[in-house]
Amino acid sequence: MSLPFLGPMSLSGFEHSWFFLFLLVVAGLAALYILMQLARHGRMLRFANMELLESVAPKRPSTWRHLPAILLVASLVLFTIAMAGPTNDVRIPRNRAVVMLVIDVSQSMRATDVAPNRMAAAQEAAKQFADELTPGINLGLIAYAGTATVLVSPTTNREATKNALDKLQFADRTATGEGIFTALQVQAIATVGAVIAGDKPPPARIVLFSDGKETMPTNPDNPKGAFTAARTAKDQGVPISTISFGTPYGFVEINDQRQPVPVDDETLKKVAQLSGGNAYNARSLQELKSVYATLQQQIGYETIKGDASVGWVRLGALVLRLAADALLINRRLPT
């Protein structure tokens, strides 16, 4: 948690927990203070004239005289917590990563169940996704139908991706597996480059956008099928986030014949599961933008352990200052 004027504070993830041994010293000081107060009270009773003591001493000794000591002990406890090095989870933008956006451009994307049609809605949402993705992410674009084509290799140039999205063209058939395998080949090149440079390979993810069932091959477990490609992605450590877009009532006109093109959620859900990714579905442009916003948060940021001791230091300093002020005020109060 983070408190106003204090900063981040946490009671977990301690990096130097052995500092808590200092609390034994703090406890010893507190015990010593109590013993000194008891001894002082005993001396007063032993040597004072009781009649005179009762006439000049207050009926109830002020408890304020103990406040400076209590605050001092509290500040030492707070400083001890700070020295133990508490940490908390901090979300920061990724400096580097590779995301391949793989979009289905088959004829079913002409369906108008999502206005103005599935393709136009997909283009608008994908461009917004590109704009909002954190700058350190390398974004690439692949369009697929019967074959897959790399339109934009991974780059931080968002304009290149958006320009390519505007030029998407419809094509026949749906080879989802081909789209995934093509994305994995692009990522393999990026990974090899990072390893040669002596660095760890950047995290990678495929975002697969489609509305229909794979038609080439018809069996997704075929060596070139979507399920086989998803298993390969998992083996390479590249999760696939799938987005199934459209409604069960979509249709297209082909040769003056109305052909139903219902959205296929189940196939894409299994692709995500097999790859270790997540599956999403959207029935409208607004829902699609919401899905992309969720992905942007997942992909664009990473969670690291951050220092959470600053708040404890500031609070300890504040309590220590109060202890000093209480000591000054205490001199003016009856004891």
From Swiss-Prot:
PROSITE patterns: VWFA (PS50234). Residues 98-295 form the VWFA domain. It is a multi-pass membrane protein. Keywords: Cell membrane, Membrane, Transmembrane, Transmembrane helix. Pfam families: VWA_2 (PF13519). This is UPF0353 protein MAV335. The chain crosses the membrane at residues 18-38, 67-87, 309-329. The keyword Cell membrane applies. Belongs to the UPF0353 family. InterPro entries: UPF0353, UPF0353/GerABKA_families, VWF_A, vWFA_dom_sf. One of its GO terms (cellular component) is plasma membrane. It comes from Mycobacterium avium. It is found in: Cell membrane. Its main location: membrane.
